[in-house]
Amino acid sequence: MTDHIVKKAQECLPNIPLTVISQGAEALVFYTDVHPYANEPYLQNRGKYVIKYRPSKPYRHPKVDSSITKSRTVGEVKFMYKLNKLNINSPRIISADYNNGIIWMEYIGYSLPNGDVSSFKNWLWYLERNNQDCTSESVEKMCFKVGQLIGKLHLHEMIHGDLTSSNILLNDDEPVLIDFGLSSYSGLAEDRAVDLYVLERAITSTHSVYAKEYNQWLLQGYEDVHKHKEFGKQGQKKLVEVLKKLDDVRLRGRKRSMLG
């Protein structure tokens, strides 16, 4: 953790208590119990909120850095706003400061019995490490729901870009997508297939014992939502296209593994 980055975030958010949740290559994520409009009389009750902060990059020219930070923050907020409008499970945007690379959003999730945040990955790990039945109906149902959620995302030609089990949180027994820093829009089956393959590989590497079952249930959920009436024949056509591309992407992945 780089202290000066946290200090910079605090300068951008004076008088706001910040607790670091995670740090990635592009951003820091904080927890706070203060609403950005806390001075409003109707918002005096404190809640839980998440703040994502994109720090400046010292290796970039200041003007270029400022432009990139603003552009990426605006892009992520717009993407999340569209998800909210489409009722695709994702955090609700509360506020944003584009110039400083700050996104303020609702807090999603809960603490598992071991204290870990309720990401899809942590939830599966908790079950596995505590000798729970990882092939139970409840696990199958959750994997199925995750697959449906991703399918709905893709049917609206939206690509996550970093689809791992860490970027899916569980909230009231429903999966919620988070972290859209690499998200994009695309109607290409190839891009949807890569999204699926990234998650498939993440599941295989972090949950190897039950990966076959998890991935099978995920794909069943993904297929199911494509067959819903609201998407008509176009949904089924897109499903055929993406499954064919997924086989191609898997083959390329295996070849890369063989070649090292």
Swiss-Prot record:
List of catalytic residues: D162 (proton acceptor)
Pfam families this protein is in? RIO1
Q: Does the keyword Transmembrane helix apply?
A: no
Where the record annotates domain Protein kinase, the positions are 15-260
The record's section on SUPFAM superfamilies has: Protein kinase-like (PK-like) (SSF56112)
List, alphabetically, the GO terms of the cellular component aspect.
chromosome, telomeric region; cytosol; EKC/KEOPS complex; nucleus
Binding residues for ATP, per the UniProt record? I21, S22, Q23, G24, A25, E26, A27, L28, V29, K52
From the UniProt record, which GO molecular function terms apply?
A: ATP binding; hydrolase activity; protein serine kinase activity; protein serine/threonine kinase activity
Question: Does this entry carry the keyword 4Fe-4S?
Answer: no
**Where in the cell is the protein located?**
Cytoplasm; Nucleus; Chromosome, Telomere
Q: Which InterPro entries match?
A: Bud32 (IPR022495), Kinase-like_dom_sf (IPR011009), Prot_kinase_dom (IPR000719), RIO_dom (IPR018934), Tyr_kinase_AS (IPR008266)
Q: According to the UniProt entry, what is the EC number of this protein? A: 3.6.-.-, 2.7.11.1
Q: Which keywords does this chain's UniProt record carry?
A: Activator, ATP-binding, Chromosome, Cytoplasm, Hydrolase, Kinase, Nucleotide-binding, Nucleus, Phosphoprotein, Serine/threonine-protein kinase, Telomere, Transcription, Transcription regulation, Transferase, tRNA processing
Q: What is its main location?
A: cytoplasm
The Gene Ontology biological process annotation of the record reads: tRNA processing; tRNA threonylcarbamoyladenosine metabolic process
Q: Which reaction does it catalyse?
A: L-seryl-[protein] + ATP = O-phospho-L-seryl-[protein] + ADP + H(+); L-threonyl-[protein] + ATP = O-phospho-L-threonyl-[protein] + ADP + H(+)
Q: How does it assemble?
A: Component of the EKC/KEOPS complex composed of at least BUD32, CGI121, GON7, KAE1 and PCC1; the whole complex dimerizes.
Q: What is known of its domains?
A: This protein is considered an atypical serine/threonine kinase, because it lacks the conventional structural elements necessary for the substrate recognition as well as a lysine residue that in all other serine/threonine kinases participates in the catalytic event. BUD32 has protein kinase activity in vitro, but in the context of the EKC/KEOPS complex, the catalytic subunit KAE1 switches the activity of BUD32 from kinase into ATPase.
Q: What is this protein's function?
A: Component of the EKC/KEOPS complex that is required for the formation of a threonylcarbamoyl group on adenosine at position 37 (t(6)A37) in tRNAs that read codons beginning with adenine. The complex is probably involved in the transfer of the threonylcarbamoyl moiety of threonylcarbamoyl-AMP (TC-AMP) to the N6 group of A37. BUD32 has ATPase activity in the context of the EKC/KEOPS complex and likely plays a supporting role to the catalytic subunit KAE1. The EKC/KEOPS complex also promotes both telomere uncapping and telomere elongation.
Q: Which family does it belong to?
A: Belongs to the protein kinase superfamily. BUD32 family.
NCBIfam families membership:
arch_bud32 (TIGR03724)
Name of the protein in its database record: EKC/KEOPS complex subunit BUD32
List the source organism. Debaryomyces hansenii (strain ATCC 36239 / CBS 767 / BCRC 21394 / JCM 1990 / NBRC 0083 / IGC 2968) (Yeast)
Q: Which gene encodes it?
A: BUD32
